[in-house]
Amino acid sequence: MESAVDPSRGFMKDVKRVIIKVGTAVVTREEGRLAVGRLGALCEQIKQLNSLGYDIILVSSGPVGIGRQRLRFRKLINSSFADLQKPQLELDGKACAAVGQNSLMALYDTLFTQLDVTSAQLLVTDNDFRDKDFRKQLTETVKSLLALKVIPVFNENDAVSTRKAPYEDSSGIFWDNDSLSALLALELKADLLVLLSDVEGLYSGPPSDPHSKLIYTYNKEKHQNEITFGDKSRVGRGGMTAKVKAAVHAAEAGIPVVITSGFAPENIINVLQGQRIGTLFHKDAHEWAQVKEVDAREMAVAAGNVREGSRRYLQRKGNKILLKIADALEANEKIIRIENEADVTAAQEAGYEKSLVARLALKPGKIASLANNMRIIANMEDPIGRVLKRTELSDGLILEKTSSPLGVLLIVFESRPDALVQIASLAIRSGNGLLLKGGKEAKRSNAILHKVIIEAIPDNVGGKLIGLVTSREEIPELLKLDDVIDLVIPRGSNKLVSQIKSSTKIPVLGHADGICHVYVDKSANVEMAKRIVLDAKVDYPAACNAMETLLIHKDLIEKGWLKEIILDLRTEGVILYGGPVASSLLNIPQAHSFHHEYSSLACTAEIVDDVYAAIDHINLYGSAHTDSIVAEDNEVANVFLRQVDSAAVFHNASTRFSDGARFETRRRGWN
C-alpha cells in the first residue's frame, strides 16, 4: 500500500535544506507529558536524512506545556489540603517556558546522542530579528553547525519575550513558532518547510467532521474562502489557522511548505520522496491545471443510493444485465486489447517485474473467458433472499436468516484488470454497490473495462452503481470512509492485504498468499503427473492458483520419473529452486523459504518420504489456498484430501481448477 509519487511534488528531488517545525500537540501527550515515542521517531527520521546529506533544521514547540505540567505537579506536592480548596491561579507562562525548555532540550540531546547525532539549542525572540547584525550572525552560525552535521534546534525564548497577547500584530516579526519557522526558512534559504501537526494536513472543514476533505494542494484563490477552521490546537497558540498563515507567507516568498501529521513515523521521509502526503503550499499552485476529480466519498454515496433505489430491479433483472455486459465485452474486445497493450508496453518500459506484467496482460481468449464466466454467474441461482436458516422461537414465531446484499464494497486490486470484470459481475448479481481502486499500472485497461460495463447497465439503474476511483486519492484516504463503505476486499499481495487490515475500521475480507502445492505420489501415473504439474505452473504462472511448490515421493527418484518431470518444467522455461534434499540431488539453488509465492515461471521442488510428510509440509508452509495430489492409490489420496488444511484440495487435477466460475460459486471474486 505504498503511496505513489505525486507529479506536482517532483521538485522534492532537488530539496537540500529542510526546516521541520514540530508543534506542542506532537511534542506532548494529552496529559502534558513528553511524547517520547513520537519524538524518538522524529529524531530517527532526522538522523536518516542527515546521513543522506540533507541539511536539517528543527523548530520545536513544547516548553510552555511541558513546564506547566511540571510546575503543576510541583505545586501540588507542596500544597496543603486547605491550599487545594482555594481558587487556583494560572501559572505564569514565562516561568513554565523556563522550566520546560530545559526538559525538552535534555530529551532531544539524549535521543540524538543515542543516534550519534549532535544537536545545538538556539533561543530567539522577535526583537532579535530587528537587528541586521543578528540576522547575519545567525546565518553564519547555522551554516557552521550544518557543515559539522549538527542539528540546530530553534525555539522562541518565551521566558524573556516582551511581546504581549494577542500574539499577532501588524508590527510583529513573528508571533509563534509557525511564523518563526517561516521566517527562518527565508533567512536561512531553506528549500522546504515541513510543519508537523496533530492532523494529517489542511481539511476543508474541522478534521472531526466526516464530510471534511483533506486538501492535498492549497490554492489561495480557491481555498481561502472555502475552508472552515475548527478549534485551535489543544495546547498550541494558533492551531491550523496559524500554520496556514505561516505556510502562505513562506510559499509566496518561494519556499514550498507541507503541513502534515507528526504522528506517522515516516511522514517526513515520505514527503521528501514526493509522496502525496499532507497539504502542499507552493507559489505556482494557482497555475497548475485544476482537474475536476469525482471524490471517492461522493462515488461511494452514489453507489449506495443507486443500490438502494434499484434493489428490486437488480434482484429481478441482475442476470439479464450481466448477459448484456458479457455481450458488450466481446463486442469491444478490440479496443480493450489496444488499451491493455498500451498498459503492458508502459509497464515493460518502466521496468516492472515480469510477474506483474504477466498479471497485467489480457492474453488472447481472456475477454471471451471473462464473458463466459459472467454468463455462468448470470445463470446461477439468485443469491439474494435465500433462506439460510429457520428457527422456531416459540409457537407460531419463526426466525429466518436470509441472504441479503452487504451494501457498498471497496475493492482494492493490484495489476490484474480482469479482476475488475470478475468483481463487477459479482457485485451486480448480489445487489451490492461497488467502489474500485486499481493499480496505476492498469489505468487504461481499468478505464476501458469500466466504461464498457457501465454503458451496458440500463439507465434506470445507472452507471454510478460501480465507481472507479481514478483520482489521485491514495488507499489510506479510501480506508477512512467507514461511514459510507461497508466492506473492503483487497486482492493482491500479502503485503497489501496485511496493510489494509491494519489501517481501517471497515471490516476486511481478504486472503493472503497463494502458495499452492502439487504432491506426486509413488503410485501416480507419470504421464498424468507431468501434464498436471505443467498446467499448474505454466498455464498462468502469475495466478494465485498456480503451483509454487512441487513435492515428489522419494521412490520416484529411482524410477527416473523425477528427472522426467523436472526436464519438462525446464523445457518450458521454469526456474527451479530446491529444498535441502532436492537442491543437492538436482544441483539447483536452494530456496530461501518454502513459504514463498513466485508468481512467475519459477517454483520450489522438494523430495518427501511419503504422503504424511507431504501433508505436514503443506500444512506448515502453505497458505491454505489450493493443494493437489497426483496418485492412483485411492487410500493415499483420501488421506491427503482429509488431512490437508486448505480451502480447495484436489485429486488428480491441476490447482488451476480452483476457480469460482468453475465451481459455480461467488467466491472467485473475493479470492
Swiss-Prot record:
Region annotation (Glutamate 5-kinase) ranges: 1-297
Molecular-function GO term, any one: ATP binding
Keyword list, A-Z: Amino-acid biosynthesis, ATP-binding, Kinase, Multifunctional enzyme, NADP, Nucleotide-binding, Oxidoreductase, Proline biosynthesis, Transferase
Pathway: Amino-acid biosynthesis; L-proline biosynthesis; L-glutamate 5-semialdehyde from L-glutamate: step 1/2; Amino-acid biosynthesis; L-proline biosynthesis; L-glutamate 5-semialdehyde from L-glutamate: step 2/2
EC number: 2.7.2.11, 1.2.1.41
Tissues and organs where the protein is expressed, per its UniProt entry: Expressed at high levels in leaves and is inducible in roots subjected to salt stress.
Source organism, top-level taxon: Eukaryota
Record field: catalytic activity: L-glutamate + ATP = L-glutamyl 5-phosphate + ADP; L-glutamate 5-semialdehyde + phosphate + NADP(+) = L-glutamyl 5-phosphate + NADPH + H(+)
GO biological process: L-proline biosynthetic process
Binding site residues for ATP: S197, D198, R237, G238, G239, M240, T241, A242, K243
Annotated segments matching region Gamma-glutamyl phosphate reductase: 298-671
Binding site for substrate: S61, D158, N177
One term under GO cellular component: cytoplasm
Regulation of protein activity: Feedback regulated by proline.
Disulfide bond positions: none
Family note: In the N-terminal section; belongs to the glutamate 5-kinase family. In the C-terminal section; belongs to the gamma-glutamyl phosphate reductase family.
Role summary: P5CS plays a key role in proline biosynthesis, leading to osmoregulation in plants.
Protein name: Delta-1-pyrroline-5-carboxylate synthase
UniProt organism field: Vigna aconitifolia (Moth bean)
